[in-house]
A protein has these predicted regions:
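Generic structural signal for well-ordered, non-membrane alpha-helical segments
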Residues: 5, 22, 38-53, 89-97, ...
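Glycine-rich FAD pyrophosphate-binding loop
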Residues: 1-12, 18-19
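An anion/pyrophosphate-binding glycine-rich loop and adjacent beta-alpha core
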Residues: 179, 185-255
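Conserved redox-cofactor binding core of oxidoreductases
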Residues: 57-143, 155, 199-201
Length: 255
């Protein structure tokens, strides 16, 4: 469970309220991305979000519901103009992570190899294109062996641990990105590393994330003297996107 997915708290954004729209969701996302997002990709992903929530429900994710027991409870997070965040209390990522692990283990056609680590891709440089046919894998006994595959998918998370201070888990070391780059794949937008704006550290322990949904429900960010500071950094105040909130917090700490 030491991965960013399991750490995620707030929820998953999808247009599930009749008063909301995919166009509004797309607009919010493009603004939060400073307009450099791929509009086609944004629209395609967000259009499929409601179906993705329905599929997660089928896999056993128990999203919070209203008192009627049917309607999903939706909260709001930074950068969103509507309530569209489906959630499982304040541990949505862990709930999704565990439900999908359970679903994978229940399928006879999926084999899971724990305590193994891919260390590099098996690939051949051809005149027309690079060809990947698997990966070098470190076995539990330390041996590195070739695993052949007709199709190889890299889904290994980010590289937040490149920074000395990070709200990413210790596993976010960029191994998959490095393997892809060494194999000749193009990497893009590597400068965009997310720092969660709010965390709590007690007595030197590892900092725990404070869910963004708190700000979505009206919580304010204040300085040690009790002064609220976000309104002077952005008109959306605590509901500004994460990058703006993170920079504002850093700026206040440097004053």
């Amino acid at each position: 469970d030491e991965c960013a997915s399991a750490w995620a708290q707030g929820g998953i954004a999808a247009v599930l309220d009749p008063q909301d729209s995919v166009d509004a969701h797309v607009n919010d996302t493009m603004i939060a991305g400073a307009g450099i997002n791929n509009l086609q990709a944004v629209r395609e992903i967000l259009s499929q979000a409601p179906a993705a929530i329905a599929w997660l429900l089928e896999q056993g994710v128990e999203f919070d519901r209203l008192e009627d027991g049917q309607t999903l409870h939706l909260t709001r997070e930074g950068g969103h103009s509507h309530r569209r965040i489906a959630h499982v209390k304040d541990r949505t990522g862990l709930a999704v992570h565990q439900a999908l692990l359970h679903a994978c283990r229940a399928r006879a056609n999926i084999r899971m190899h724990e305590s193994h680590a891919a260390v590099d891709l098996l690939h051949a440089h051809a005149s027309s294109a690079n060809t990947c046919f698997g990966a070098w894998v470190r076995e539990p006994d330390g041996r590195v062996t070739p695993w052949l595959a007709g199709h190889t998918v890299l889904a290994t998370g980010g590289l937040g641990q490149l920074f000395s201070r990070s709200t990413n888990p210790w596993t976010a070391t960029g191994d998959g990105i490095a393997m892809a780059a060494r194999a000749g794949c193009a990497v893009q937008d590597m400068e965009f590393v997310q720092f969660h704006p709010t965390a709590l550290q007690i007595n030197g322990q590892a900092a725990g994330l404070i869910t963004e949904a708190l700000r979505g429900e009206g919580a304010w960010l204040k300085l040690p003297n009790g002064e609220r500071f976000m309104p002077r950094h952005d008109e959306r105040a605590e509901l500004a996107p994460r990058d703006i909130v993170s920079r504002a917090i850093h700026a206040e700490m440097q004053r």
